[in-house]
Amino acid sequence: MRKLLNTLYVTTPEAYLSKDGLNVVISVQQEEVFRIPVINIEGIVTFGYMGASPGVMKLCSDNGISLTFLSPQGRFISRVQGATKGNVLLRKKQYQLSDDASWSLHVVRLMIGGKIQNYRNILRRYIRDYGENEDINRAVQVLERAKRDALKAQDKTELIGYEGMASNAYFEVLPILILNQKTDFPFHGRNRRPPKDAVNAMLSFAYTLIANDVAAALETVGLDPFVGFLHTLRPGRTSLALDMMEELRAYLGDRFILSLINKRQISVKDFLFQGDNGVVKTDKGKKTFITAWQARKREVIIHPYLNEKVEIGLLPYVQAMLMARYIRQDIDDYPVFLIK
């Protein structure tokens, strides 16, 4: 099993990345503030517009380290990656299957079905821990019906309809799962670009990080993150990463954010409310989020398909590996990640 190394998150917008030998150096206003050997990291995510030197880009490329640039608010800008990994036969098969409507529909049914079941399992866990709730029970029934229908969808348009129905039911009752700081963290449904409340700001931020991790994992196992089966092909869009993150959103993103709020690890003071420009995290809030995110990635679970201990941060890699095996026909079906 691949070892989970650290992802270096550079949250200071004024930071500039350069190299010194085999070290990544971070400077602010031309003063060095941090350095780390490349052998200790597997990825760099930087939030800001100062950029990085060509030397550090080459250093990352040569050592298989993904270098991702996000805006200070967490919106994806670009990614630097090295030579294509994996063998050409795997990618050729991936491209063929992407054009196979029947095969693509089958695999995206599984992904969306898994996403809906993970929504359901989060709600069922609340009932198990805190007792019956009429609104949550109704939402669970909608999710169970949506999953059954999704697994029988005749085309992708129909499938997306069931996914939308499930998401609406789930997010409608999500505020019930916020047990502490309810008045500080109101939630009235999913919104973005820009997010209008702190919960949506955290959801969008987490989903960006997940998509980045999945794209890097796909590249690692030799798949093309830009050619998917559900999300349409578009220049610059990592369609397969967006496909595969669907099953991971609830566990990696939603549960993490609920935990942050309920354990009071983050507060309303960690956000800036900018009216029509939406809500963003303060520098302190961003660091609080990232620190907790990194700690969460180091936690260990039993993978439901492999029945092996896996660090949570390796879940994107494990699912990418399983997708590669399925495309090569080494396994009979793609095992989506399902939480308990």
What would you call each of these model-derived segments?
Residues M1-K19, Q29, R35, N87-F226, ...:
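Active-site helix-to-loop segments that bind/position phosphate- or nucleotide-bearing substrates
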Residues V24-V25:
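Hydrophobic residues embedded in beta-strands of well-ordered beta-sheets
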Residues V38-A52:
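Extracellular/luminal Protease-associated
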Residues E42, P54, K58, T208:
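Short alpha-helical basic/polar micro-motif
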Residues V45-Y49, L70, A206:
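Short His-Asn-centered micro-motif
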Residues A52-P54, K58-N63, L67-R109, R120:
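Phosphate- and other anionic-substrate recognition elements at nucleic-acid/protein interfaces
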